[in-house]
Amino acid sequence: MKTKTFLALFVCALAASAIAQARATYTAAEAAKHVGEIATVTDRVDGVHQSSKGNIFLNMGGKYPNQAFTAWIPSASAGQFSNPQQYEGKTVAVSGKITLYRGKPEIIVTNVSQIIIK
């Protein structure tokens, strides 16, 4: 009897852990309400820009400067992205911690695995 009770409690704890680890998914417009969360932002990339310093910006929810959200790829990580223009016009899922930069939400992307084309 104790074994069955323990097994049932273990299965419940395991299920609760799996649910807790599932990341929330938001649109570009919703991201600003979830600053500080580790989440996934899924939306269409409306513009891709690479700065003279090598930083890459994927603007979602509108074109710069009216975008709702930005996936920022620092120049130190940009080498992992051989063709950032491939994201333009496509729906992507960007995962990481949502932060604010100049009043707009962003996720800093340091690994190619953080962006998935849907």
Language-model segment annotations:
Residues 1-8:
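Bacterial N-terminal signal peptides that target proteins for export
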